[in-house]
Amino acid sequence: MEQIIGRKKEIELLTEYYHSGKSEFVAVYGRRRIGKTYLVRNLFRDKFAFDMSGSIEAPAEAQLSNFGFALREYGDSKQPIPTKWTEAFEALKQLLKAKMKGERLVVFIDELPCLDTPKSGFQQAFEHFWNGWAAYQSEIMLIVCGSATSWMIANLIDSHGGLHNRITHEMYLAPFTLRETELMLQAYGFSWTRISILQIYSILGGVPYYLSLLDKKQGVEGNVDRLFFSSHAELKREYGRLYSSLFRNSEAYMRVIEVLASCRQGMTRKEIMEKLKLKSGGTLTKVLSELINCDFVRGYNTRDKKIKQKDQIFQLTDLYTLFYMTFCHPGTTDTGYWTHLMGKPRQNTWYGLAFERVCMLHIPQIKHFLGIDQIHTEYYSWRSKVSKPAAQIDLLIERADNLVNLCEIKYSQMPYTITKEEDMRIRNRMADFVAETGIKSGIIPTMITTFGVRLTQYAALAQVQITMDDLFV
């Protein structure tokens, strides 16, 4: 088995399900290029009793042919190619029956949503296969994968049809953390420093396939130019494919993404509706929910006198999408664009914005550093409705032990200096927050920086300091 980087929890769970001694139906989902197929195939490669993969946008006849060829590979080479899905799953049933010897039989169907072409009868045949037979066979472990998250959620995970409550386990594959990204790059022979890893993570996110495209002979800037700004840049063309593979009617999702990309602070549901000129919010609710499920968007509560879920703020957090919409969507013919921006305010501003997003994606690591892993917390950003200009706090972690970590997030390539003016701004923000919310909890000023805070007369303001290294755990 090829070494699998990261995914420790997922490997433990899949191994546990394999040895459960009962029938298992596991749905693995997540964005395109996240490593779903890689994980399952590497973990169970010599244990498949049957496996096949759906083909994106192929007609029913082609999908059935692929299914039939897989049946031949694992069983009778003279097996007729099925012409409808009831025949296909009946043949699979007979194949598995012939293999039953009291040992686990792993059935893997990759890109399952692709098989559900219009009027093909796939869903009904699949439901009958599982509900009518496979669910009662203790040897069977059925694993299905899909990038089309909207289909996976609607038809499997939250199904109200024949597969309602039939899935025994769902498994969402999230992007890599900074630490997992570091481990992957080390395994590929990179000797990059953590600031370089943070910078590339700020652009690619923790998507394993994107990271696999990096060239260790180039630095961050050279890789970014090659992947985004060269004449045939691989990741410039990825954007449209990404959303069309994840969501049916992807245009609705991309419109929401484009609106959120235009507002750094995030937007309320009402503001999004106004921007898109929507009269009804039913579709928007579904779109936002699925974007959140895929880690493209986060919805965080707001706080006035109390924490309010009703007025949630939605913010684009997918780093690849954010970078694409900021620098590629407008378009440029400069093939060395990112190199030419080195050290300039536009690039530094980007890294500052992205570092805020990276911190939001590493709340568990921040909580671990603070020693509050087991304490219930609410986290959110805050914007004053009174002060002019409006005071804003990047991140607040409100804890059940009656303390609040008021976090200032600062990116720099050297220890951050708190000046007299910055000290005053932070103190004013704290005062505004306490006055407007009426919060009674103790406030702990917390600085999250790349290289710590430079020791000056104002450094004492940062009662807690969290550095970039503390996110790499």
Where in the sequence are the language-model features?
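Phosphate-binding site recognition
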Residues: M1-L341, P345, P445
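A cross-kingdom feature that marks ATP-driven nucleic-acid transaction machinery
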Residues: Q3, D311-V473
